[in-house]
Amino acid sequence: MLKNALYLQVGAKNSTISYFKFLFSAVFLLLTIGFFTNNSFAQPVRWQQRVKYTMNIDMDVITNRLTGKQQLQYSNNSPDTLKKVFYHLYFNAFQPNSSMDVRSRELGKFLINDRPDWDPRVKDRILNLKPDEIGYQKIISLKMNGIPQPFKYHETILEVNLTKPVAPKSTVIFTMEFEAQVPLQVRRSGRDNPNTKVRYSMSQWYPKMVEYDYEGWHPTPYVAREFYGVWGDFDVTIRINKNYKLGGTGLLMNAADIGWGYDVANTPDLKPITAAKRTWHFVGNNVHDFVWAADPDYKHLTRKMPNNGPVINVLYKNTEEVAANELAWKKVADAAVIVLPFIEKHFGKYPYPQYSFIHGGDGGMEYPMATLLVGPGLGTVIHEWMHSWYQMMLGTNESMYAWMDEGFTEYATDLVEAFYRDSVTNAKNGDSNANEKVINSEVVLLPLEHNPNYKSYYFIAKSGLEEPLTTHADHFNTNAAYSIASYSKGAVFMEQLGYIIGAPVRDKLLLEYYKQWAFKHPNSSDLMRLAETVSGLQLDWYKEYWCNTTKTIDYAIDSLWEEAGESKVRLKRLGQMPMPIDLQLTFKDGTTLHYTIPLNLMYGAKAAETSQPVVTLEAWRWTHPTYIVSFKQRLTNLLKVEIDPSKRMADVEQKNNTLEIKW
C-alpha cells in the first residue's frame, strides 16, 4: 500500500461505510416439418417410440368402476430388440401399504418448522382407505398380435415378458381388457372430493405404456411425483350415465350428438336421449397422455381465439356463492384469451385445437390440452397452462429433469402473470393498444416477478436440506427439497441464465428451444448445447455448478483505495460457485459506470442488454478469489458500489453486494 493512499477496508472496525441491506425470507396437431426446419440451427435427430391408443370404456357411476378394451399400436423406432415391455398401473398406488402410502408416511415423520414434511393432500389417507375406496387396475387379458402374453404385477408397474421380441423398426399391436376402480380422491386422480364435490377426475386412469428411449426403459413406480410418456394418438370412447358432462384431452368427435356448447349450434344443454348411458368420443393427436373429468353438474364456458386459434373450454361447478363463482370462472376464460398472444410471442405457438380448464378433485395438475383445477385462481390457471409448453410439448423426463418442467413453467408463469396484471391495468386506464405494445416489446424482464422463487431458493440453500437438481424426483430426502429444487431453483436457473448470456439472448434461446425440441424429449444437455449455440458462450460450467452441486454464490465488495492516479475496487468471491459479475458505480453528480466482468470459463462475454453503455472488462479467472476494477474518478466522488444491481444473480448473502459510502 502506497503512502498517502486513501484506503477503505469494507467491514473494518470504525469504518464510516454503511450498507443497503436486502432482506430475503424463505417463503395438437403435429407442427409442420417446415416450422421446425425453417431456422438457422442444425436440427436434432433422435429416434422415438410411437403409440396409437384406441380405448373403449364403460363407466359405472354407482360402483365407481370401469371396464375397458384397449388396442395399442406400438412402433419400436429404436435400434434395439425389445424382449419385454412395461405398463404403468397408477391406480394401484391408492391401496394401504403401497409404496406411495409408506413413502408419504415416512416423509411425515420429518419435521420442517414443526410441520410434517408430507404432502398435506396425501398424509396417511391411503392407509385408511376402505375396500370400496381404494384404487386398482387389473389386467383381464393381454395379447400381442393376437397371441396371449405373460405378465407380472409390480404394484404400479406391469412387466410383460414377450413370447416374441419386438424387432427394431417394427410395429406390433397389443390388445388388452382391463378393469379398474376409481379411488377416493387423494392425489391427482380420484372421485368425490368433499371440497370441490367433483365426481370424477380421471387422470392416470388407463394402463399406459412405459417410455423406452435412448437410455432404455423407465418403469418408475408411482409414489406421487412425476411422469414421462410416449408421444402418440388417442382415440377414446367413454360410455357413462347420460346425465354426466365431460371434458378432457382432445376434440369431442360426436359434438353434434352431445350438444352442451361443444356443437356448432352451441346447444346449451345435453341433447336428450332415451338410453341410460351416453357415449362421448374424444380424439387427441400427438400427445403423451389423456385425461378426462365427469360430473352431472358441470357448467361450460367457451371462447374462440381469433386467427384460427384454439377453442378455450372452461368446465366448472357452482359453489354456494353462485354469482361470484361464475364471475371467477368467466375470468379464467377471458384471461386465457388475453394472455395467449403474449405466450406465443415469447414461448412458441400453441399447436392444438383446444384447451380445457376443468374444475377437478385435485390440482392444479397439467395434462395435454387440459388441466384439472380445484378453483379459478388465475395464478394456478396460468401455471398449469404454461405446462403445455414445458412438458406437454417438450416432454422432458420429469423424474430426471423436474426443474426443466416445473422450473421453466414457474419462470414463464411469472412473466405471463405480470403481463396479465399490466393488461388489466391498461384496460382500466383506457389504453386499448397497450397490450399489443407489451406483447411486441423487447424489454429486459428483470426478476421482480421472480422474487418469491429467489427467496425460496435462498431458504433451502441455507437450510442444510438442499439436494442437487440431478436428484431423481422420487428420491429427494424431503418434499421441501424436491419442491424448491424443481420449482424455485429451476425458475432461478432460467432468470439467472439471462444474467449470464443476456436477457434478449435468453429469450431467443427459449423460442429456439421450442422450435427445435418440441415433441422430442430434450434433456439438460440438449438445452445447454443449444444455449451455447445461441449465445456463442461456453456454459457447461453453469450446468455443472447449478444443477450437479449445491454450491452457492456469494460475492462481496472487499476494499476501495486510490493508487497511481486511479481508484480501485477489489471484489471478492466468498462462495464456491463462480459467476460473471455486473458492477455499477454511482457518483455524487448522479453519473454511473457500468461494467460486466465475464467468467473466464465462458470464453466470451454477454452482449449489451439495453442501450445503457457497459464496459466489458477482462475475464475473472475462476481460480482467483479476488478481482480489481480500476476507474479514473476520485474515490471521494464515489457514492455507491453495487454488485449485480439487477438482482438476477442468486447470491445467498445480498448484504455484502452493495456498499453506500457516507463521506
Question: What is each stretch, according to the model?
Answer:
Residues 70-72, 89, 170-184, 234-242, ...:
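Short, hydrophobic/aromatic-enriched beta-strand segments in well-ordered soluble domains
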Residues 84-147, 243-244, 586-599:
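Solvent-exposed beta-hairpin/edge-strand motifs
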Residues 50-51, 89, 282, 313-570, ...:
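Hydrophobic alpha-helical and helix-loop surface patches within well-folded domains
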Residues 252-256, 504, 517-663:
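Non-catalytic accessory/interaction domains
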Residues 75, 115-195, 619-636, 646-647, ...:
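A surface-exposed beta-strand-loop module
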Residues 99-112, 179-234, 647-663:
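Glycine/proline-rich low-complexity spacer/linker segments in large multi-domain proteins
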Residues 40-67, 96, 539-541:
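N-terminal, polar/Ser/Thr-rich
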Residues 209-216, 224-382, 411-414, 423:
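Hydrophobic helix-coil surface modules that form long, contiguous segments used
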